[in-house]
Each structure stands twice: as structure tokens, then as C-alpha cells.
Regions:
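Active-site helical microenvironments for divalent-metal-assisted chemistry
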Residues: 1-191
Length: 191
């Protein structure tokens, strides 16, 4: 990749630093998409020994690129995102990926296709980490930032995505317990 091509790609990806997500940080500000992507990549790094048969380097690459479409559309929370939103994001993302030089263009497109199919262990791990990180982040935020429907969502979100792995199922149960403990400690503030 020529320096000018790298810089152009980085300038596009930089938008994720300012693209906020629905969730707040423990410090009380909106989390950025870049921070979310970084942390699921960190989760993949920490969990590499739990999945010795998986290509965790590939999982990490998936984690790093999974939300790049939000450079063009912004973040839409999962509970608000429509099929049209997903289609628009995918079209804009694939248009951008097509503008990248080889072999990056082909690798990214192959990763996105694999992630969408959710047939490989690597894609399943990435998707589970994506869901888990969102719930962990909500547990770290002040409960006053939770919307009413999130009390129930905190207890169930991502369960189907972790079911393939005993380790991730146990992690989901631990995160669920953190949610229950948080609600008990900070109180149910639903309106």
C-alpha cells in the first residue's frame, strides 16, 4: 500500500474516533466506535489461549474492521437498526473497500463475507465478543444512562451468539451476574 493510500484509509477510519455509540463510559461520556472496536480486539488477544484451534489473528482483524461501515452512517444501536440501515451501511462500506488497493481490498472483502456468514469459528468468536463487549460496557456505565428496555437486554443480549462455546457461555453468565449485581446495588431506575 502506497503511503498516500494508507493515509487516505486512515483518514476515513479516523471518523470512528468521533462516532459515538449509545453506551457511556465509566467516566460519563459517550463511548466511541473506535474504543469499542479496540476493546473487542483486546478481548480476542486475551482469549487466544481459550481457542487454540482458531486463527485468533483473523478474529482480531475482524474485530478491528467490523464497524468501519459506521464511518459513513454513524452508529445505530442494535435495537433501532433496520434492514434498510444495514443495507445502506453495507453498500457504503463495500464501495469504500472496493476503492482500496490489492491485496487489502480482497482480504477485507473476504473477512466481511466470512463475518456475515457466521459459519467459521473465527466469525462466531468475533460476533460473540462484539455482543459481550456491549453488555460489559453497559455494566461499567452509570445505571442512570440505561434505557428502560436495557434492564432486560442486559440479561439476555448475545446469549445465542455465545452458545457455541462453553467458555464464552460461562463468560456471558459472569457478565449477566455483574448486571444483576449492578441493578441490585444501584437500583432499578426504570420509569
Amino acid at each position: 500500500m502506497r503511503p498516500s493510500e494508507l493515509l487516505a484509509a486512515l483518514h476515513t477510519a479516523e471518523k470512528l474516533k468521533d462516532t459515538t455509540r449509545h453506551c457511556y463510559t465509566s467516566g460519563g461520556r459517550h463511548e466511541s466506535v473506535a474504543e469499542h472496536s479496540w476493546r473487542i480486539a483486546l478481548m480476542a488477544f486475551f482469549l487466544r489461549d481459550e481457542f487454540p484451534e482458531a486463527d485468533v489473528d483473523k478474529v482480531t482483524r475482524m474485530c478491528l474492521i467490523h464497524d468501519l461501515g459506521e464511518c459513513f452512517t454513524g452508529d445505530i444501536p442494535a435495537f433501532d437498526k433496520t434492514a434498510q440501515d444495514e443495507s445502506t451501511e453495507e453498500a457504503l462500506l463495500y464501495q469504500w473497500v472496493a476503492s482500496l488497493p490489492s491485496p487489502c481490498r480482497e482480504e477485507m472483502r473476504a473477512l466481511y463475507d466470512e463475518m456475515a456468514a457466521l459459519e467459521t469459528q473465527e466469525a462466531q468468536i468475533y460476533k460473540a465478543l462484539d455482543k459481550l463487549e456491549a453488555v460489559i460496557s453497559h455494566n461499567e456505565s452509570d445505571i442512570s444512562t440505561w434505557e428502560d428496555h436495557e434492564y432486560d437486554l442486559q440479561l439476555t443480549y448475545g446469549e445465542q451468539n455465545v452458545a457455541f462455546s462453553p467458555y464464552l457461555t460461562a463468560l456471558r453468565q459472569a457478565v449477566r451476574q455483574e448486571s444483576l449485581d449492578k441493578i441490585a446495588r444501584e437500583g432499578d431506575r426504570r420509569k
